[in-house]
Amino acid sequence: MKKKVVSLLAILIILVSSIFNISFANEKGKVILINLNRTNLEDMLSMSILKDKVNKEGYIGLMNIRGDRGTDDKRSYASIGAGGRITLPDNKYINFEEATNANKEAYKAETGKTPKKINDMSINYSLVESQEKGSYGSVLGSLGQTLADNNLKASVIGNSDIVVNGELVKNRNIALMAMDHFGRVDDGNIDNINIKDNTMPYAIRTDYNKLKSETKKFYDNSDVIFVELGDTYRLDRYKSYLNENT
């Protein structure tokens, strides 16, 4: 199973590289951030194409993404977006959704702000938690807000959803990196990006063809794209069900 995930990631690197090769001839100054959550440098460099790119044209850097009052994925994402350590409420109070006619009205009623394409419907919980219990003075959504203040557009593609007892458990916490001060992201696709695959953890995986097409779709109108692969997270969560042969 791990080999299959690595193979899929290698395909993604090739696909994204093709987008760069096409686009860089015409314009500069855009960023695609690919999140390989729950993996490490050794795993990444086991992909020959990625190792080759790092050797020829890449760099390796270290960043402290420790959160405030604990260390977990959501705090790490939010700390990147805040530019400093941040604390957050439980996952059940983090609820990123793509805008619909119904939830746009609910979001505006609760925040007083105009919704964008992707919104944290429970952003007030996170704001209160970080302001009242935070120890470092970091402000949620500083990265996304800085982009917005400079007329730069962010998009988020992908999720780390899993299936538990037949029910979909949503995880779109990648948006904590990209959101503004009010939990909003300009554009993206966090809903329709996975496909069923019984050979993969939780019987779902990222649709890499869809991921490629969506990246191309949002690239022209975005300055920064945050891509959540999801499969590395799902594999790590599922590993206790596997053995050395799988």
What are these model-derived regions, one by one?
Residues 13-18:
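Hydrophobic core
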Residues 26-29, 41-224, 230-237:
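Active-site-proximal alpha/beta segments of enzymes that process anionic O-linked groups
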Residues 33, 45, 245-246:
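Metal-dependent active-site segment of extracytoplasmic phospho-/sulfohydrolases and closely related
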